Amino acid sequence: KQKALTEKDPVILFESMIALARKGDPKDKNSMLAALQSVNYDQLTESQQIDLIRAFELVMARMGMPDATAKAAIITYLDPHYPAKGGNELNRELIKVLAYLDAPKKKKKTVPLLSVAKDDNSAGQQSATNSSDLIMRNPQYGMDIAKILSKLPPLQQTFYATALSQVKTGWTPALLDEYFKWYYKAFNYKGGHSFVGFIDSSRKAALKNVPKDR
């Protein structure tokens, strides 16, 4: 265990912390989280950054919320890297952990992304892009397909909105207004009944966290 906590190779460290999270002692949680923070984030590839954040996520999911000091340290470590300039998958992992930790800047950073985030080829977002390829292969149907795709729900924006729906503190009137305007727009997308139901559930969860004076 001590060898795992002092491992210098980031790939081996991530694998070791994931293994310990699944079978280890919860008393080691803070030591494990500190070990993950010892990694130089900027020297990692994007794929390794995703693995690092998933290791944070698994440790906390299995062992519980860290204490206030450890929580603040993780926020200080991860917050400067969000939003990332890389792919959507990295940003999804970051917002999941930062929302769980209730990082104070996450709302101010995320709400503006609701209107500009675009889907990409990252995990979970290939379907719309694969459909877009049809436009190139079948130009005679291009305009019709493009119109259909333009009405599909933007998955990255939906992920951000849902991640914020459980956030209870730190909302300003301006952020709340911008946030709920996204839900109003989202109901116009053609995602089917399941999407509408999902969005409505997310909106209702978010409404529970609106201050009573709003």
Language model regions located:
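Long, ordered, helix-rich scaffold segments
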Residues: K1-R214
